[in-house]
Amino acid sequence: MTMVGSRTSPIFNALRVELNAREAELVEIPLIQPADPFLDMAGEDLRRRIFLTENENGDSLCLRPEFTIPVCRNHIALNAATPKRYAYLGEVFRQRRDGAAEFLQAGIEDLGAADEAASDARSLADALSCVKAIAPDAPLEIVLGDQSVFAGMLKALGLPQGWRKKLLRSFGDAHSMDLALAELTGTQRRDPLPESLAVLVAEGDEIGLARMLEAEMLEAGISPGAGRTPVEIARRLIEKEDLAATHFPAAALDLLRQFLAIRVSLDTAAVTLRAFAADNALDLGAVLQKFEARADAIAQAGIEMKDIIYDASFGRPLDYYTGLVYEIRDASNRQDGVLAGGGRYDRLLTMLGACEAIPGVGFSIWLDRLQALAGEKQ
């Protein structure tokens, strides 16, 4: 019996052929990775699932939980020229309630391409081709979102910068978004802080607040280095106090909720968004031009736009995603979970230490889910 976790799996070999045909350098990434980049930049869900350890010097290490961050770090370390396309195929390790903790992923990271619309379309087309190569008869659902359109909507509504950042961090997480909107309307109750902390928060004294928090953590036997640092906690408390002082008109929040409820096929999405903006006197011109350029590029790549769902609320609550996000799923619901997911992350390489901005877009495929959908004989 050949399992998909094996590098001798037929699916593994078939995907290697697919990746080799796509003008991308197949790279080998070490299984053991420094943990800090994942802990600092990955979402809360992934942070909870990482297998952590330490080396003899006390440095935090982890088993590779995904490929995008280490592929980008490797590109920076090599000081490689762009544009550059990398492919990968190998094991990742995550604590999961269901399924094995070790499984295979494959994907492509496209770094430094000048034509954003074309590289976005190519990423989606490559992901779709790889999935169809393994499961040619499977009914697929493609869902597409756009972080930049949501950001443009927040700007057009006149939201303060602090609230824009908070809502962007919640984009794609329905529960977190509901809590943020309730907070913005002033309907969410907040637990009061102890008076000694509340005074420092009200004064915006980040240094004094961090010192007090560190002292309280040490007194309680909690290491200040475990989890968020006292400085990070202090900064977040002061930010929350500033945000709580801002309340937004109910009509504007209703418009935001109407926007998030938009879910249409991609071939009608641009018209729908332009009509929504015109009807409500919102300036979304620049972001919608980019949205339309990408839709045109997707059509030119041979993908039927009527088969793609644009969901205005679909995103990823990660700081480095900047535009396109997408997922390919099993439309028959026989297989739970995402088969392939991708998106544009133009901030990631700078956050990882690149000396200049390097745009990026990429995707990952879950081989175990794809095998289950394809019904490969074992």
From Swiss-Prot:
Cell compartment(s), UniProt: Cytoplasm
InterPro entries: aa-tRNA-synth_II/BPL/LPL (IPR045864), HisRS-like_core (IPR041715), HisRS/HisZ (IPR004516), HisZ (IPR004517)
Domain of life: Bacteria
Keyword set includes NAD: no
Predominant localisation class: cytoplasm
Record Gene3D superfamilies: Bira Bifunctional Protein, Domain 2
Keywords from the UniProt entry: Amino-acid biosynthesis, Cytoplasm, Histidine biosynthesis
Pathway info: Amino-acid biosynthesis; L-histidine biosynthesis; L-histidine from 5-phospho-alpha-D-ribose 1-diphosphate: step 1/9
Molecular-function annotations in GO: histidine-tRNA ligase activity
A Pfam family per the record: tRNA-synt_His
An example Gene Ontology CC term for this record: cytoplasm
BP GO annotations: histidyl-tRNA aminoacylation; L-histidine biosynthetic process
NCBIfam families xrefs: PRK12295.1-1 (NF008948), PRK12295.1-4 (NF008951)
Homology family: Belongs to the class-II aminoacyl-tRNA synthetase family. HisZ subfamily.
Additional note from the record: This function is generally fulfilled by the C-terminal part of HisG, which is missing in some bacteria such as this one.
Function: Required for the first step of histidine biosynthesis. May allow the feedback regulation of ATP phosphoribosyltransferase activity by histidine.
Oligomeric form and interacting partners: Heteromultimer composed of HisG and HisZ subunits.
Protein name per UniProt: ATP phosphoribosyltransferase regulatory subunit
Organism field: Brucella melitensis biotype 1 (strain ATCC 23456 / CCUG 17765 / NCTC 10094 / 16M)
